[in-house]
Amino acid sequence: MAKVSRFGGKQNVICRVKTASLEPTSMKVAVIRRAHFNAAHRLHNPAWTDERNRTVFGLCNNANYHGHNYELEVKVTGEVDPATGYVIDLGWLANLIKQEVENRFDHHNLNLDTVEFRDLNPTAENICVVIWQILRPHLPETQDLHIRLYETPRNFVEYPV
């Protein structure tokens, strides 16, 4: 139902909306937790010549490595639990990210210090997929997981798409 009123010579429409009752079991909601870690890496394909690596990866192929201040967004989508009102306990999710991602990668050289990237080029794309693979087993199958990783304020990757 709408009500029309006049104010200052202009016609204003005031809308009154009747709200429907929400059933928590039918609501799919996304919850997002942000995290941060700093890490060094080198983009390099050992099957290629040094010249080809420099051509393809540019400054990111620096033999002495380089670093990024990564910003991570972990999005969990699922039904709202009617007992708690949560999709997921954000404290639990924060702790999971800290233990499984930040502690593993923060202030480490991804090429040298991590098992995940010994044989995998640590591009932003690969880091994003690896983080998804690390976190996915910890969540119920009924919840969807989406990762967004910022390598710089203007460059980010997402998985899955």
Predicted regions and their residues:
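Charge-rich, low-complexity N-terminal segments
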Residues: 25-161
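Extreme N-terminal basic, low-complexity initiation segments
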Residues: 1-11
